[in-house]
């Protein structure tokens, strides 16, 4: 990925302009194993990808590497089984203070020896928007081939780029049609539209309007290397203790890195691990459990048969021993074997569920990929056109706009009503207060004439009648 004003911008521009295209095309057509496209088209055509483990897993499969998957890491302290490497995504801001601290720290561990650089796969990112593929290849092409089946495309790329400079390796990646097509097949339509509007001069690794960058951490010859395509050299973080795993060294390096980065209150990053396909280990374990289940079940049947023969007095009542492939050569009761068989059945059921869950995850990866890459523009435009043709679009728009107006109108009406009620209440109170002296004068005059104020039943009944009428 290119950061705004990043160091690889000039290189990417040179590639886009097709500089040295003839020599590189002639050199790399063999590496790709296919007829190369014009270099400018390949360099300009790489699209931005989201940081998603499902997307990366499917991308690895499209590269031809089938026995690998990518998982997101949420807890650094949680152990991870047999990782090939880690991919770290962070927001790239060149002038950020924390970024300068990281640069000052990593500059001391640059590996500048050309022979050492040529012995590993380290490629400079000279093609915009290719950082996701660069990060994956930096892990895969530095793994032991005995432990990982790379597939034809990656094997050819690794073979034919051996001994090349980091810049030429970056050009080899950008000029491999299989990699470019697989990469772009997982991009969102927005990424293509953005590329068409702005060109290839600006690069980021997620369609967020900001620059994000991937770097890889991988163990090579007992040393932890950090491979960043925007750096001029690979970085060697050193080895680890004999009693440690390489992931322990990685945790310490990453904890220090995150401590520097989060000092600026910026925690927008994520960490992914490249690991073996979990389904392979589960399938192998299921095979072993089913073999043991068959052995225990067969031994139990023989034991029960021997017990029956012993009780009937026919044949040899000697109990068979459990085969040495499962347990020590000693006699077991039928109850022991039944308990062991029950545990095996439980383990088999658990692992079958785990395998089903992994298969469901792969299915959801494909569903999410279809949703992510599908272009809904035509559907939305056609749908809105049909609504307009039927004359209901304006009504639907009004229905969605009017509620807000109604709410604001009702609020104003409520305020006016409240003010009117308050004014009426105030007027009534004032009127009542004003009539009080007049009522007192009438009562005083009645008392002077010898009449009791209470002897006015007609007026009181009239008031009560009015209340009844109101009811």
Swiss-Prot record:
Keywords: Chromatin regulator, Coiled coil, Hydrolase, Nucleus, Protease, Thiol protease, Ubl conjugation pathway. Residues 405-471 are annotated as: Positively charged C-terminal tail required for binding nucleosomes. GO terms for cellular component: chromatin; cytoplasm; nucleus; PR-DUB complex. Residues 240-256, 298-324 form a coiled coil. One of its GO terms (biological process) is ubiquitin-dependent protein catabolic process. The active site is at residues 131, 213. It is found in: Nucleus. Its main location: nucleus. GO terms for molecular function: chromatin binding; cysteine-type deubiquitinase activity. Residues 314-326 have a biased composition (Polar residues). This is Ubiquitin carboxyl-terminal hydrolase calypso.
